[in-house]
Amino acid sequence: MTDDRIIGAGATREDDAADASIRPKRLADYLGQVPVREQMEIYIQAAKGRGDALDHVLIFGPPGLGKTTLSHVIANELGVALRVTSGPVIEKAGDLAALLTNLQPHDVLFIDEIHRLSPVVEEVLYPAMEDFQIDIMIGEGPAARSIKIDLPPFTLIGATTRAGLLTAPLRDRFGIVQRLEFYSVEELTRIVRRSASILGIDCTADGAGEIARRARGTPRIANRLLRRVRDYAQVKAGGHIDEPVAQAAMKMLKVDPEGFDELDRRLLKTMVDYFDGGPVGIESLAAALSEERGTLEDVVEPYLIQQGFLVRTARGRMATHKAYRHMGLKPKNPPQDLFAEVPDVG
């Protein structure tokens, strides 16, 4: 299920093209994710000092937080080539073998959506990661035979938004595991200002902060909003972005101070107006909104839940006090305290 909204975290073709021009090349330029950055700096320096390939790295976390960017930075810091592919693209064991046999010593192979590798491909990957060898079947039927091919030492970087779907044998073969967290407004403000500087956009600190506050903790969304605010400023404000201009642009884009768009607000309003705040089943909610169940579950709800505007219970979805306050309403049906004592009526 893709999220093509302006505040969607999934990558669009425009995002990919724009990101290439503003992507940091070094860890020093990789803003935010301080623990990850500090750890990777040590691991990279140690591997280079020993003359070894860096241990295999698993990077996981929500979309749009910089997993692909970090893989490019790691390869640049190591001074080696980066080969980029994704789980769904590697359909057969032979596809993976072709990638692996073309690697040079210490190269980095980046597999996005690694949780989508097929079991057959995974079986080939295990000895490649562990022993730098692969077994390939030559021929068919009774004449088929297995040959062992030695590989140069390399680093596999796997990225996934769904670490729970990785098989245990694959997960256990990564020596370094890094989780990317959502960014603070201050970190996103620095990212917006850096992107604006590279793209030649006249943007004040207050203007960058206004964009950052509505970016849902996600650099990809922040950079996308920056490009749209730039368009607005170019036509309406002489190309200058300050706080009032950013606010006016966000109003045009219908992105509110919480980073919600029309669909987010419509979901909360429907829950309050039609279902008295809940609990309401997902099918009923989807029917009331004329949206697919999958869209609500995979695209809309996660951020609302993460920010505390919505809760899932055994009986259905419920709007929280925070949701009522966001809409300027007094809670009609406050969510019950799950840990409240039940009165003794016996």
Swiss-Prot record:
Region feature (Large ATPase domain (RuvB-L)): 2-183
Subcellular location: Cytoplasm
Protein name: Holliday junction branch migration complex subunit RuvB
Gene Ontology MF terms in the entry: ATP binding; ATP hydrolysis activity; four-way junction DNA binding; four-way junction helicase activity
HAMAP family: DNA_HJ_migration_RuvB
Notes on the domains: Has 3 domains, the large (RuvB-L) and small ATPase (RuvB-S) domains and the C-terminal head (RuvB-H) domain. The head domain binds DNA, while the ATPase domains jointly bind ATP, ADP or are empty depending on the state of the subunit in the translocation cycle. During a single DNA translocation step the structure of each domain remains the same, but their relative positions change.
CDD domains reported for this sequence: AAA (cd00009)
Keywords in alphabetical order: ATP-binding, Cytoplasm, DNA damage, DNA recombination, DNA repair, DNA-binding, Hydrolase, Nucleotide-binding
Residue segments, region Head domain (RuvB-H): 257-346
Gene Ontology CC: cytoplasm; Holliday junction resolvase complex
Coiled-coil stretches: none
Chief localization: cytoplasm
Sites where the protein binds ATP: 22-23, 64, 67-69, 130-132, 173, 183, 220
Annotated positions binding Mg(2+): 68
Subunit record text: Homohexamer. Forms an RuvA(8)-RuvB(12)-Holliday junction (HJ) complex. HJ DNA is sandwiched between 2 RuvA tetramers; dsDNA enters through RuvA and exits via RuvB. An RuvB hexamer assembles on each DNA strand where it exits the tetramer. Each RuvB hexamer is contacted by two RuvA subunits (via domain III) on 2 adjacent RuvB subunits; this complex drives branch migration. In the full resolvosome a probable DNA-RuvA(4)-RuvB(12)-RuvC(2) complex forms which resolves the HJ.
Catalytic activity, EC: 3.6.4.-
Catalytic activity: ATP + H2O = ADP + phosphate + H(+)
